[in-house]
């Protein structure tokens, strides 16, 4: 029997690894939700309803975490005792720092020129960069290179923030 304290992977009876079969995760989630959904316990006592709600909440949280590659990577690293240090570890490779500056300048220039096409192109570039880096992250995690994976997670978090800023700029310019 799985407990509320077991890992997300254990909850869904999946291997604790980065590479996951999305269909297997979806199926496992539906199975767990079917078993613990609060509607199944409508006629039960308050204690059982509360427990069902806890399990349903836990299943939703676990599913959201495992469904998102970046969250899954962060979670895997936390299970391995690796703190990604996103709040206080901002040290990054010089090449990535240069890339950050280029992206920021691209955002500023395109926003100042009200150039939505340039922002769209930058957003596409960021999405491609994220895809490539997530593939690399999977290789790092599944090979046990946890410190390099933590660095990759921090970089991906930055890429997501920049992509969000680009999206906000596009929205602002289109309204």
Curated annotation (Swiss-Prot):
Keywords: Chaperone. PROSITE patterns: DNAJ_2. One of its GO terms (biological process) is [2Fe-2S] cluster assembly. InterPro entries: DnaJ_domain, HscB, HscB_C_sf, HscB_oligo_C, J_dom_sf. It comes from the Bacteria. NCBIfam families: hscB, PRK03578.1. Co-chaperone involved in the maturation of iron-sulfur cluster-containing proteins. Seems to help targeting proteins to be folded toward HscA. Interacts with HscA and stimulates its ATPase activity. Belongs to the HscB family. This is Co-chaperone protein HscB homolog.
